[in-house]
């Protein structure tokens, strides 16, 4: 559950319904064949689910219930703002300088005017693109590789896993904080992301006979569409 933020709540909902509609299609079979590590993945999926149910989801529910919505929005904006330079770099690597400039502009505007707590840049017409290294590698022609479920982080692939590990290593919050501060920052980030995903729980539980396959298919479809559709308008979260 924790890794869904990778492609946005609204987009995950669209991908989830597509996964349900295509559950018995040749595409679903092809995606199943892209999961040679399924026994291991299912074991990690079970671990993640247990951890989520015992710790992360209850904390996220309390967070959503007791923290005012404007403050939660500000926290989410702050997290997203820290990712803008990374998105700009990936746009450059993909040969999209205009989007890179937009990302840098978003970072500067939101940082200067709101310390990253607001998103006035969107009001100025600078839309968030949300690029990552996994998408860059896909644009460069690297295949997704086998589907992976990462401990705590959730659904991924070999290609996206490389991108996510690289992003963690070069996370800017690591450079400006101590080990304990970074751990606290990461915990807040996880809880905030999980709180945003709470509305998706009922959709998945009611629509999926096999939650593992449902989430895998939705993830793979969404990631592929992100790579194929990058010539269109910037991402809107």
Q: Where are the regions a protein language model picked out?
A:
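Beta-rich strand-turn-strand
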Residues: 72, 76-78
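N-terminal signal peptide c-region/cleavage motif recognized by signal peptidases
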Residues: 25-26
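Second-shell loop/turn segments in exported
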Residues: 41-46, 65, 73, 89-99, ...
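Bacterial N-terminal signal peptides that target proteins for export
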Residues: 2-16
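Mid-length scaffold segments of soluble, non-membrane domains
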Residues: 81-158
């Amino acid at each position: 559950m924790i890794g869904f933020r990778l492609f946005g709540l609204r987009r995950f909902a669209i991908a989830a319904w597509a996964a349900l509609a295509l559950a018995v299609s040749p595409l679903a079979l092809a995606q199943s064949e892209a999961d040679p590590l399924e026994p291991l993945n299912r074991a990690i999926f079970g671990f993640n689910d247990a951890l989520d149910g015992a710790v992360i989801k209850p904390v996220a529910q309390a967070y959503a219930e007791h923290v005012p919505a404007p403050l939660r929005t500000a926290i989410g904006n702050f997290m997203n703002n820290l990712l803008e330079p990374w998105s700009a770099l990936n746009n450059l690597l993909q040969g999209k300088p205009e989007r890179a400039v937009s990302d840098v502009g978003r970072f500067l505007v939101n940082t200067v005017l709101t310390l990253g707590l607001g998103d006035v840049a969107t009001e100025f017409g600078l839309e968030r693109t949300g690029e990552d290294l996994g998408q860059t590698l896909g644009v460069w022609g690297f295949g997704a590789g086998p589907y992976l479920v990462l401990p705590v982080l959730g659904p991924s692939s070999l290609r996206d896993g490389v991108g996510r590990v690289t992003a963690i290593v070069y996370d800017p919050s690591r450079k400006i904080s101590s080990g304990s501060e970074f751990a606290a920052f990461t915990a807040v980030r996880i809880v905030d992301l999980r709180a945003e995903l709470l509305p998706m729980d009922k959709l998945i539980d009611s629509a999926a006979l096999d939650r593992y396959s449902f989430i895998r298919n939705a993830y793979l479809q969404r990631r592929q569409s992100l790579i194929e559709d990058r010539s269109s308008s910037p991402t809107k979260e």
